Amino acid sequence: MLDLYDAEVRIDNQSNSDVYQRHLGVLADAADVKVSREINGDYTLDFKYPSGTELFERIAVNCIVKCEGQLFRIMRISYESAQMAQISCLHVFNCDAKRFHVPNIGSTDTSDTIGVSPYSVINSAFEGTPFTVLSYEKVQQLGMKWVGATDGFLIDFESVDKTTPYDVMMQVIENCGRGEIYVNNTEIALVERLGT
């Protein structure tokens, strides 16, 4: 089942529940629903929807679609015919983490960026965004381990500015040479391996 929400969605991470501005309806007529996820890559939702329905008039780029408990942002609406539209969505992490700009990570004091944990770099990058970086304990409760949690693995991370949290996450993965992105709506972590 797919639910449609307006473009502004707030997540209440404290109570671990979704708080929506406005539910626009259930997309009961959705067809050919396909969710795809690449490790450390795009997490997408694609579906077809008849254009002659009342709810179709409310579907717009940037609206949120909830599928399988995950939130996806509509990125593109194209038409296969006059009666059928193809809707393409990106997970809110893949989309929204690229919209925020990190003013600066680190400083001229290299103790902020040399020999630091992947967690501390990622936590700094996502500070002030709607995303919550999960703690070591929370990730362990999910049956996974943060990169560097058990072996004390540290990285050197060059001070960067004018970047996005998403780009920082990708750079940390490259610097570590390992890790997989765990994402549950706006909760994120860099784990050794997804699953248990």
What would you call each of these model-derived segments?
Residues 84, 92-196:
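Charged- and aromatic-enriched interaction segments used to assemble
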Residues 17-28, 62-68, 166-174:
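Short, solvent-exposed secondary-structure boundary motifs
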Residues 44, 69-71, 178:
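Extracellular structured ligand-interaction cores
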Residues 63-90, 94, 182-184:
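Short beta-strand and beta-hairpin "edge-sheet" elements
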Residues 1-58, 90-96, 106-116:
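Juxtamembrane "anchor/assembly" segments of surface/extracellular structural proteins
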Residues 41-45, 83-85, 186:
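Residues at beta-strand starts and edge strands
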Residues 34, 74-78, 157:
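Catalytic micro-motifs at enzyme active sites that drive phosphoryl/nucleotidyl and oxygen chemistry
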